[in-house]
Amino acid sequence: MLEGAGTIRDSARPGPRGRTTDHQEDPITSDVGTHRSAKAASWVYSEEFVPEDEVLLRARDRAAELGCPAVLPGVGAVLQVLAASLAARAVVEIGTGTGVASIWLLRGMPADGVLTTIDVEVEHQRAAKAAFAEEGVPASRTRTIPGRASDVLPRLTDGAYDLVLVGADKHSYPEYVEQGLRLLRPGGVLAVDGALSHDRVADPARRDEVTTIVREVGRSLRSDERVLPALLPSGDGLLLAVRR
């Protein structure tokens, strides 16, 4: 098991299987329960498939200390693959946190790639800079911008970026997604973390504000002719959209 990933196993633990009134297993319910159990085990396996090293684990520890959300390892691995496959030289990250996602992205980007990362919390960016230093990332490869993304994003150039990661303030996801699409070049990828919102998005009975916002963002991208979307179960859900 991956060090520091205990919460992954806890969150993936399946519930009890259904039983008939005479205490014999209902075959149909048993099959569903077995499938769910296998799915949970597969999710944990996929999250731990690419292990995090000491730099990432320390950044994750800082996130826990600051009460700052961080992408799970499965999402980080996907982001690294995306950055590498796109040869992404210009990336925008909305929500720096303590640099967990940033490190994954930088590892996938070419040596001359530049990550522009935005966070309203200066303390978070200070922690991220410590992670960048531990990783040995040259200062020229990161542009850390303190401030509200809603104020910063409009100042960035249209169609100039290969990859945009949305991972902060779910209330503002609709705005960030629209801004992200504006920033992407044709063939660029928008990535939205937390797209399943702790399994609430898939439950139509859940109608709280954040869940509704995240669900509508997914529906909007699914019907948007400007993009080709896909929803991955990695981490807490990773919604991807390729700009046509």
Where are the regions a protein language model picked out?
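A short alpha-helical cap/connector motif
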Residues: L2-L163, K170-A191, A195-R244
